[in-house]
Amino acid sequence: MVYALATSDNIYAMKTHLFLGPDKLVNTLKRFGIHGNIPAIPSLALGTYEVSVLELTKAYAILANEGVAISPSIITKITTMDDEIIYKEKPKETKIANQSDVYLLNEAMTSIFDNNLTYNIRPTGVPIRSLLSTTYSAKSGSTDTDNWMVGYNPDIVVAVWSGYDDARNVELSEDTKFGKFIWADSVEAYYRVTGTNPTWYKTPDDVIEIELSPFSGFYAGFGEYTKKLYFRKKNLPWYISLLKEENSNT
């Protein structure tokens, strides 16, 4: 799944969607703040339901906040000329998803920038990797008329849509890349302007990292690229659980 996320290989999204059942994705989207008459159809896994930039940003912010939804606000506080606070926003926090499950996704979505995952196709974030100074989770997406780039870490969430305002097809290959470069410039500018030191997520106690082949998900063969993949300790792949059992019996 890490490779599928990195390269936007949609067959895995479709198979997972059909395996879990269409209603599962509809309910998850609504939990993450995307509402409306969402159709429970197979193509929903491909992003066929229209959402706004704000809706998508709010949904990804839940991942950035480790499973907690925080009500967005334009004004966080108001002060006097003497820096006396006369108003401070008190955002509402709601737990939406399990922290450990979100951590697995956050780690997996960093792979969009991993050039070592280039096999048949290149991960979609590789063209902007050299512009980034720290770790981000991200996902790109596209249709004939839209190009998306959404990414985050514990400090910031940014979503960028690019396309024509008259819904014309985006036909020039150069035009499909603008969103990614705008996104990279935006997230990096945040650190330059604020002087904030980048942070990343602490691995939960019930999560384990294992060095495996990101292409097969199994232990790598000789000379094969390996990557740290993350699992819930209670939900390890069968071959790892079997190996642990064999080792404990020797």
Locations of regions flagged by a protein language model:
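A penicillin-recognizing enzyme superfamily signal
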Residues: 3-6, 52-58, 62-249
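Active-site-adjacent helix/loop patches that line small-molecule binding or acyl-intermediate pockets
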Residues: 1-65, 104, 108-111
